[in-house]
From Swiss-Prot:
Its main location: cytoplasm. One of its GO terms (cellular component) is cytosol. This is Protein NipSnap homolog 3B. GO terms for biological process: mitophagy. It is found in: Cytoplasm, Cytosol. Belongs to the NipSnap family. The modification N6-succinyllysine is found at residues 45, 48, 57, 166. Keywords: Cytoplasm.
Length: 247
């Protein structure tokens, strides 16, 4: 009987809830907002890259009639070449589904571009990303070049490394040598991956700015903290196409 009473007291006693760790990268607010960005990478046949780009340039209005294109670039260096990289904005997943269905029924898009050019593509990669809550899409001051810095962070999620990563990015922003376009956290694709898109006036101005930043104690301290959570990093140098909204 005493054992039974003790068990009942334990079962009925108020539970003490363990505080949850919050992070500025938490997916909740982004998913409630719904807006996400689709990263598409096409690996093209070397002999067909220029033809593919010219054909898309002539048909881009057919595609953008269905959803917003943020930017369209070719990869100059930083991995495999003969690649194109583009970003598309969607209000939510229902919006994307509706767009894909509409494109499948758009005969002009299918006949003028998609069907004739599919054979030019060796491989496609697609990621679904959200802008981090502390970042909005930036507007570059003029035409230039772009760098996509991709960080593969340690497992544990933004609750583990989000604050340190934010401080590292902002330390570079505050120096003013480069314009931050966006910070994107992958939802579908490799997890614990963050993409940071930067604008620079030129490759040489970027190199000079990076050299300067490495001598700034604020940047050095912030990066030293963030890098403890980093598994790998890859930088890709991007050239905007003539039809890219982001130039």
């Amino acid at each position: 009987m005493l054992a039974l009473r003790s068990g009942l007291r334990t079962a009925l006693a108020p539970r003490v809830l363990t505080p949850q760790v919050c992070s500025p990268f938490a997916t909740g607010p982004r998913q409630s907002n719904g807006t996400f960005y689709e990263f598409r990478t096409y690996f093209l046949k070397p002999s067909k890259t220029n033809e593919f780009l010219e054909n898309f340039k002539n048909s881009v209005h057919l595609r953008t009639a269905h959803s917003e294109m943020i930017g369209y670039w070719t990869v100059e260096f930083g991995g495999r070449t003969n690649r194109v990289f583009h970003i598309w904005k969607y209000d939510n997943f229902a919006h994307r589904t509706a767009v894909r269905k509409a494109l499948a029924k758009d005969k002009e898009w299918q006949e003028r571009f998609l069907i004739p050019n599919l054979a030019f593509i060796d491989k496609q990669e697609v990621e679904i990303t959200y802008l981090v809550p502390w970042c909005k899409i930036g507007t570059p001051p003029k035409e230039g070049v772009y760098e996509l810095a991709t960080f593969q962070m340690k497992p544990g999620g933004p609750a583990l490394w989000g604050n340190a990563f934010k401080r590292a990015v902002n330390a570079h922003v505050e120096l003013g040598y480069s314009t931050l376009v966006g910070v994107f956290h992958t939802e579908y694709g490799a997890l614990n991956r963050v993409h940071v898109l930067w604008w620079n006036e030129s490759a040489d101005s970027r190199a000079a700015g990076r050299h300067w930043s490495h001598e700034d104690p604020r940047v050095v301290a912030a990066v030293r903290e963030s890098v403890s959570y980093l598994e790998s990093q890859q930088n890709t140098f991007l050239i905007p196409t003539s039809f890219s909204p982001l130039k």
